[in-house]
């Protein structure tokens, strides 16, 4: 007999954030590291393309704020999800582990949101 009131899982929400963070970390983050961390310091970037004024103007625009928010938050959720499942796989049982790892990710998301909004 099929249970008419099945227990709902919250895992798809966390897997969605994990997947989005993993894709962001694999596709967008390396490009940003290459541009800002390698090409810009050695002078292989054209002129004032990334001058302080232009970067500040981008960071203060709506698209820039969304980009900064996603650049911080998505890899954060991915990493904390991996840590949560790594602890489980290593048989290190953190009391209320779901609350610890996902709660920390949620708190840091709110802190990031406040920081990005107040730029």
Swiss-Prot record:
Cellular component, GO, one term: fumarate reductase complex
Keywords: Cell inner membrane, Cell membrane, Membrane, Transmembrane, Transmembrane helix
Domain of life of the native organism: Bacteria
Biological processes annotated in GO: fumarate metabolic process
CDD domains reported in the protein's UniProt record: QFR_TypeD_subunitD (cd00547)
Transmembrane segments: 26-46, 55-75, 99-119
Compartment annotation: Cell inner membrane
Topology in the lipid bilayer: Multi-pass membrane protein
InterPro entries: Fumarate_red_D, SQR/QFR_C/D
GO molecular function: succinate dehydrogenase activity
Function statement: Two distinct, membrane-bound, FAD-containing enzymes are responsible for the catalysis of fumarate and succinate interconversion; fumarate reductase is used in anaerobic growth, and succinate dehydrogenase is used in aerobic growth. Anchors the catalytic components of the fumarate reductase complex to the cell inner membrane, binds quinones.
Subunit structure: Part of an enzyme complex containing four subunits: a flavoprotein (FrdA), an iron-sulfur protein (FrdB), and two hydrophobic anchor proteins (FrdC and FrdD).
Recorded family membership: Belongs to the FrdD family.
Name of the protein: Fumarate reductase subunit D
